[in-house]
């Protein structure tokens, strides 16, 4: 979603990217294939990096890592070693594939280190760098405070929770989404919730009349 992407760059005070792959929605295979072709073109014809750093567990993470590995470009993975144990999740497959071909496994936590060791990754490739989500929060905490978001919702003197949903496995199936929404409604009786609705989630909520 272009609008959401622009908002994220602005909120995090990030510069415009030098390259935009221009890959939108589609099936997992379509996304991975299009990303691989677009990124390979950059590496071969525009700018070949000395090191590719990929983040997280999305399709572009695994796709770009595969391109780099096949072009003999070193790859580092931020958030390496995170596991859900559920191979029905597309993100879990992306994690496993990416970590299997990376040269540097940059982990957020001790459990991630152990997951990688249990999978046979050598200690020399595992480097704990910490949780980048917490880094982001620390860098932006003053900006967050300046937004006075609790006051906007009348919550400055109350406990509250913030909710967002975006994983396809949670929002694309009407039964699963209804179960989650019922749980949120129930919990909202105990604590007020602010629901930051992702475009994909909004579409499903409207489609399923939830």
Kindly label every feature range from the protein language model.
Residues 6-8, 14, 145-210:
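Donor-nucleotide binding loops and adjacent catalytic segments primarily
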Residues 2-3, 22, 101-176:
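A nucleotide-sugar donor-handling region in carbohydrate enzymes
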Residues 8, 20-122:
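Active-site and donor-binding regions of nucleotide-sugar-utilizing enzymes
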Residues 74, 125, 192-193:
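Residues at the starts of beta-strands that form the adenosine-phosphate
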Residues 87-91, 139-140, 207-208:
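Short secondary-structure transition/capping segments
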Residues 1, 81, 111, 199-200:
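Residues in the short beta-alpha loop(s) of Rossmann-like NAD(P)-binding domains
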Residues 59, 82, 133, 168-169, ...:
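Short, glycine/serine-rich, charged loops/turns that create anion-binding
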């Amino acid at each position: 979603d272009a609008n959401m992407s622009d908002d994220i760059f602005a909120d995090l005070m990030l510069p415009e990217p030098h390259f935009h792959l221009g890959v939108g929605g589609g099936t997992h295979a379509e996304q991975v294939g299009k990303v691989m072709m677009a990124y390979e073109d950059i590496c071969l014809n525009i700018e070949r990096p000395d090191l590719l750093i990929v983040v997280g567990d999305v399709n572009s993470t695994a796709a770009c890592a595969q391109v780099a590995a096949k072009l003999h470009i070193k790859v580092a993975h931020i958030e390496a070693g995170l596991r859900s144990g559920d191979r029905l999740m597309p993100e879990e497959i992306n994690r496993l594939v990416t970590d299997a071909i990376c040269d540097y496994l940059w982990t957020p936590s001790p459990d991630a280190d152990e997951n990688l060791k249990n999978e046979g990754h050598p200690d020399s490739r595992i480097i704990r760098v910490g949780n980048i989500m917490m880094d982001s929060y620390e860098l932006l905490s003053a900006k967050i405070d300046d937004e006075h978001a609790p006051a906007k919702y009348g919550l400055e003197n109350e406990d509250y929770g913030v909710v967002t949903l975006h994983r396809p496995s949670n929002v694309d199936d009407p039964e699963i989404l209804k179960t989650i929404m019922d749980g949120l409604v129930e919990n909202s009786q105990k604590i007020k919730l602010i629901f930051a609705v992702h475009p994909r989630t909004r579409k499903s909520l409207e489609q399923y009349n939830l």
